[in-house]
Structures are given as structure tokens and as C-alpha cells.
């Protein structure tokens, strides 16, 4: 039999059948059976589901081996379970749907289900790992040649069953899993299937063991615009500047949480966001609602009954039409060569702090702040840049050297501390023609980084002297703070002011220039923005942690007036970063994919309904809409007018004069 798809890894994307195909997928339990799928097998019900999936354009299914239905305490696998799995894979094959198998389940939908051969507390112990790999080996050997198989996934959120006590304990399990799979099956991709703040999803640490990273993102935010942007920012974080392919392995909401209409708008926004941020696919949670509402865990987790794109009676929710339209459109976009003939060219990278993905003695910020708070400055910096029209990636601090030849600007946002070696590398990078923007923070609310120095190269790199009073926790900013520009900066003229509201106390450094220029001061005429020439490049030093201030840790709603974005656009202008396509509204995210004679441009409205104009530095020859639910109303040689409903997107093929 010919395989449904052959999925392989090439640098930052997964190749499907030798080319790029976006893996539009769903997570799956049967509508009529839910988690009882394997125990209460109903082939007719499953065929009905998969046939409907195919009609909607679904290309991939992530499904789950509920271990207690497959094996006993001695890891002896039930023959009838294997036959059911084979039949399920046959049904997928008949419908040309690719299967990604989650092997250790484990956790599912608000309940931890029994793993027969091990206690939860023993999951990472050698005896338990040996038994687990015996199970994995048996399943993989049995089905590695089945044409419906596309990939093997360790678990479903194993860290919710038992989190590794430390990074090495968790990675030991993943290493053995990867080695076991690859020793049997080198033809299919491998991933971990864990939660985003797990050790098993840390790209810098797992990239040698998995073929893609698959974050599970269920994000919440008072700011709907920031919420939409955050999905793309998280994909960039996990990509680590193209180190590894990324599939958005789980995302969604229950229509018992939100209306079906808003649910559909959300999925539309995220699908185009995933495509715009180089994701290799996106798997919606989940295919259908379930009819057995009193089954565990639905009895106490009613939201879990309603995540589907299909209702429990089999009728389609509005989101199903979104999925069907996206499936058709993405085929046309792929034919043009997105990701292969047309590629992004980001010239900026935002740096993730060293302590997020590696432990250092007495550096406890990841533990104190937690994963989500630790990454907020990075996420917001990515959002501010993207909403300023500046394409950018995210890169881990220990990997920054790989960006030195491809990025014109590196951004180190709201920095508590960076490695001494990082500062030295930055100096060398700038002297050779790169550019650096860095902002600092010493404290927020009750958090203080007291016994800390962000850098040792204040004068050598930034051209400033740190003049903070001995013993001070930092200069406090609270309430309305004005940034007054003493000199021109890109699009900002001397005398311009930008006000920022700071509702929570923020503590930072005070400095004076040594051989740098003071670009801006605060309300009290204290310098807050400096510019220093170092060799062939420039260093921009901001003493206000404006990225952290715009995070949901500090403010319920970001400032979407565009004035903060203007700072980044001005720096981008000064350092020669190309912004070929832009719009005045920061609520619109624009991601261009450049070709030799034309471009693909994806625009996503993360806000309310609006009419916008995208301007181009190129002379436009022809505009063709190839995707999305926004409407192109007119275009000229330099501008495109678009009517963009709330949470809508548009994909354009832009031909220009050569």
C-alpha cells in the first residue's frame, strides 16, 4: 500500500511527500464513544467520523493509546486491542488521513488514567522506563509499516501525570524513547506531546531527540489583540530561530466556554497565524463534542464535552466551515510554494534568557517567576516588533551566535541578567556591524533582583555609567511616565513625547552617558534611552522595561495606539531593516514571504472589524487574493485597501514591477 503521507524533517519545517503541506489536523476521540473508544469499539461510528473529517479537508489526526485498554501489569498487550488499532489505521488510510500516535496515556481531559505496568510516581525510574519502552517497542514494531502512520508521540501531557523532578530526569525518558523508536523506525517523526512549560518541550534541550516540537496552547488574556498575537509569539519561541519544525499540537476552546461564533473566529485567527509563523501544522482540540456527558472526566469537567468542531449530534459548528475553507485555500497557497519558493526573511531576533532553559547555581528566576512570567518580556517584544511591521524570530541566549550573520538587530528585552559571555559576544557582534537593543529591569511589584547586575559592560558596550545609589533596589516608576525625546530617532522627531501608564511599581537602573548620546529622558529629565556607536554598529539602551510593562503581568490591556511600536520602527529604520509592507494599525499583523519575482503576504486582524490600507515600497503590478475571509476592495501601484472583519485574515499573491 502507498503511504497516506511521508513526513520527514528538513531544518525548520516538516516535509510531507517531499514538499511542504500544512498538516491541518484534529485531536481525536470518537463522538459516540469518547475515551471509551478502545473498550467499547464501534467501527461504524468511527468510520462516520473519519469520513466527515475527510470531507472537511482534515489531513492529520492525533489519537491516543489509552494504556489500560491495551496492556496488563506485565506489559502483555491484548491481541484484540492490536486488531482494533490496525482497523482504525486502515480506516484512516482509506480516507487519506495521516495518524500521529500518542503512546503513553496517562493524562486525558482532566483525569490521570492508569498505566498498568507502573505507578505514576515511578514513571521516570529505570525499571518503569524499561517497561514503558517494552510497550512502545511492541506497538511501533507492529505498525511502523502501516501506510497511515505519520508520527510517534511519547505521551499526552505526561508532566500532568508526573513531572520530572529535574530536567535531566525528564530528558532521560525522552532520550530513551527517541532511541527506541529510531532503532525500529527511521521513517516517521517523533515528538514528546507534553505541556508547553515541560522540560520535554524545551527546544534547545530536546532538538536532538525529537523531529518537531508540539506546544499545547490554551491561552487566556483580558486583551483580545494581545491574546491573538501571543500564539504566533509562542510558535517563534518554540522554533528557536528555525532550529526545529513546530506543530501547534493542541489549541482550541470549548463552546461551553464561549459562543460558537467567537470560537470560529478564534480558530480562523490561529490557523492563519500558525501558517504565517512557519508552523508545519496545527491540530485543533478536538474533532467533536461527546454524547456521554456523565462519563469521567466529563462529569466534573463539563467544558471537555464541548471542544469539538462538530456537535454531539454530528452537525457542523461554524468553525467547521472555517476549517473547510482553510483546507481548500491552503492547497492553493502550497502550490505557489510557500515555505519553499517563498520564504520569510526576518532581520531581527528577540533573545530568550539563559535561565529559562538551563539551570545555573543560585540563578533562580525561572523557579521564582515560573515559566510563563519568565518569558513575558520575550513574548511582548516579539508582539511589539510584529505589530510594528518588523518580522522577527526568537532565539535562546546560548544560541545567539547563529544569528550573527543573518540578523541586523538583536533585541534583549526587560533584562534581569545575561551571561557575561553573552555581553562579550554582543560587543563583538555590534563591532562587526550588528545592532543591539537592550532594556533593563530590576524589579516588578514585590519581585526584586537585588543581588544582581544585569551586565558588566555598561561602559564598554553601552557607553553609559550605572549611577544607581549603593544599596538601592532601583529607581521606581509608577503611574504616568513620559518619554521625552531629546534627539531625533528614526521616525520620532526631537521634542516628541510618548507617555506610558505603569500601574504596578517597576524598578530599574539609573545611568549617565560616557560616550553615548542621550536620546530620551523621563518626566524628571533622567536619561532613559541612549545610543552608542561601537565599531560598525549601534547599541540602543533603554532603562525602562517597556516590554514587561506591556505584558499581562502588569497591564490588562496593551497600548495599541502605535506609539510604543514607533520606537521599534524608528530603530529599525536607523539600522536599515526593510519593511516592504506595512499598515498604520498595530492590530494588523503582516507577514511577507519573499519570492524571486513576487511575494506572498499574510495579513491577520487580531482586533475588531476595520478597513485598512497596506502600503508597499515596491511598485505593484497585480494583486490576487489566494486565501482568507477578508476582502480586497481596491489596489493601486503602491497600496492595497482591505476590509477586515474581526479576527479575519487575508493571503495575497503580490506581483510587483521588477
Describe every region a protein language model picked out.
Residues 2-210:
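Active-site mouth of glycoside hydrolases
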Residues 30, 64, 157-164, 217-218, ...:
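Active-site clefts of carbohydrate-active enzymes
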Residues 97, 186-188, 242-244, 431-435, ...:
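A short helix->loop->beta-strand "cap" motif at the edges of active sites that frequently abuts
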Residues 132, 287-347, 360-361:
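Aromatic-rich peripheral "rim/lid" segments of glycoside hydrolase catalytic domains that contact
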Residues 188-259, 289, 328:
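Glycoside hydrolase catalytic-domain groove-lining segments
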Residues 321-406:
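Aromatic-Pro/Gly-enriched surface loop or interdomain linker
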Residues 404-416:
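Short, well-ordered secondary-structure micro-motifs within conserved domains or adaptor modules
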Residues 414, 418-658:
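A conserved amphipathic helix/loop scaffold
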Amino acid at each position: 500500500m502507498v503511504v497516506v503521507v511521508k513526513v520527514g524533517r528538513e531544518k525548520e519545517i516538516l516535509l510531507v511527500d517531499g514538499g511542504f503541506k500544512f498538516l491541518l489536523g484534529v485531536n481525536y476521540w470518537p463522538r459516540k464513544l469518547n475515551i471509551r473508544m478502545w473498550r467499547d469499539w464501534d467501527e461504524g461510528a468511527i468510520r462516520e467520523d473519519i469520513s466527515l473529517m475527510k470531507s472537511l479537508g482534515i489531513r492529520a489526526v492525533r489519537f491516543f493509546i489509552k494504556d489500560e485498554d491495551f496492556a496488563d501489569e506485565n506489559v502483555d498487550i491484548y491481541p484484540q486491542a492490536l486488531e482494533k488499532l490496525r482497523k482504525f489505521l486502515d480506516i484512516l488510510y482509506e480516507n487519506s488521513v495521516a495518524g500521529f500516535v500518542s503512546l503513553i496515556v496517562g493524562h486525558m481531559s482532566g483525569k490521570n488514567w492508569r498505566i498498568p505496568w507502573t505507578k505514576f510516581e515511578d514513571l521516570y525510574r529505570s525499571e518503569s522506563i524499561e517497561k514503558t519502552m517494552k510497550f512502545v517497542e511492541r506497538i511501533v514494531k507492529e505498525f511502523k509499516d502501516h501506510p497511515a502512520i505519520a508520527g510517534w508521540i511519547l505521551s499526552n501531557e505526561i508532566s500532568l501525570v508526573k513531572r520530572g523532578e529535574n530536567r535531566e530526569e525528564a530528558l532521560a525518558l525522552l532520550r530513551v524513547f527517541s532511541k527506541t523508536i529510531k532503532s525500529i523506525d527511521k521513517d516517521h517523526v517523533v515528538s514528546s506531546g507534553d505541556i508547553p512549560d515541560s522540560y520535554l518541550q524545551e527546544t534547545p534541550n530536546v532538538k536532538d531527540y525529537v523531529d518537531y516540537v508540539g506546544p499545547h496552547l490554551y491561552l487566556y488574556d483580558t486583551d483580545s489583540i494581545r491574546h491573538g498575537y501571543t500564539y504566533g509569539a509562542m510558535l517563534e519561541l518554540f522554533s528557536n530561530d528555525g532550529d526545529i519544525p513546530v506543530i501547534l499540537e493542541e489549541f482550541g476552546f470549548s463552546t461551553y466556554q464561549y459562543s460558537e461564533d467567537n470560537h470560529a473566529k478564534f480558530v480562523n485567527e490561529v490557523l492563519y497565524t500558525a501558517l504565517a509563523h512557519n508552523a508545519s501544522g496545527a491540530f485543533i482540540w478536538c474533532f467533536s463534542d461527546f454524547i456521554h456527558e456523565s462519563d469521567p472526566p466529563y462529569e466534573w469537567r463539563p467544558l471537555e464535552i464541548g471542544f469539538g468542531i462538530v456537535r454531539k449530534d454530528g452537525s457542523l459548528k461554524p468553525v467547521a466551515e472555517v476549517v473547510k475553507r482553510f483546507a481548500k485555500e491552503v492547497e492553493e497557497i502550497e502550490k505557489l510554494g510557500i515555505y519553499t519558493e517563498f520564504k520569510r526573511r526576518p532581520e531581527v531576533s528577540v533573545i530568550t534568557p539563559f535561565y529559562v532553559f538551563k539551570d545555573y547555581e543560585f540563578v533562580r528566576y525561572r523557579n521564582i517567576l515560573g515559566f510563563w512570567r519568565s518569558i513575558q518580556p520575550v513574548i511582548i517584544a516579539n508582539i511589539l516588533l510584529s505589530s510594528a511591521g518588523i518580522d522577527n524570530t526568537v532565539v535562546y541566549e546560548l544560541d545567539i551566535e547563529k544569528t550573527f550573520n543573518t540578523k541586523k538587530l538583536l533585541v534583549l528585552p526587560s533584562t534581569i541578567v545575561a551571561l557575561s559571555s553573552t555581553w562579550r559576544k554582543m560587543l563583538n557582534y555590534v563591532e562587526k556591524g550588528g545592532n543591539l537593543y537592550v532594556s533593563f529591569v530590576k524589579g516588578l511589584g514585590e519581585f526584586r533582583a537585588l543581588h544582581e547586575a544585569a551586565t558588566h559592560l555598561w561602559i564598554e558596550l553601552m557607553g553609559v555609567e550605572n549611577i544607581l545609589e549603593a544599596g538601592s533596589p532601583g529607581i521606581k516608576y509608577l503611574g504616568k511616565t513620559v518619554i521625552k525625546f531629546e534627539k531625533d530617532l528614526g521616525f520620532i522627531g526631537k521634542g516628541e513625547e510618548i507617555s506610558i501608564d505603569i500601574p504596578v511599581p517597576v524598578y530599574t537602573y539609573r545611568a549617565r552617558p560616557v560616550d553615548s548620546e542621550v536620546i530620551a529622558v523621563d518626566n524628571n529629565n533622567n536619561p532613559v534611552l541612549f545610543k552608542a556607536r561601537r565599531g560598525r554598529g549601534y547599541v540602543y539602551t533603554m532603562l525602562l522595561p517597556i516590554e514587561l510593562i506591556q505584558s499581562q503581568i502588569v497591564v490588562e490591556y496593551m497600548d495599541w495606539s502605535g506609539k510604543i511600536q514607533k520606537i521599534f520602527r524608528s530603530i529599525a529604520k536607523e539600522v536599515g531593516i526593510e519593511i516592504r509592507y506595512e499598515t498604520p494599525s498595530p492590530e494588523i499583523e503582516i507577514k511577507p514571504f519573499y519570492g524571486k519575482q513576487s511575494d506572498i503576504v499574510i495579513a491577520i486582524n487580531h482586533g475588531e472589524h476595520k478597513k485598512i490600507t497596506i502600503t508597499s515600497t515596491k511598485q505593484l503590478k497585480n494583486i490576487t487574493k489566494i486565501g482568507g475571509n477578508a476582502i480586497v476592495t481596491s489596489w493601486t501601484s503602491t497600496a492595497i485597501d482591505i476590509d477586515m472583519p474581526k479576527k479575519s485574515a487575508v493571503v495575497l499573491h503580490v506581483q510587483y514591477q521588477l
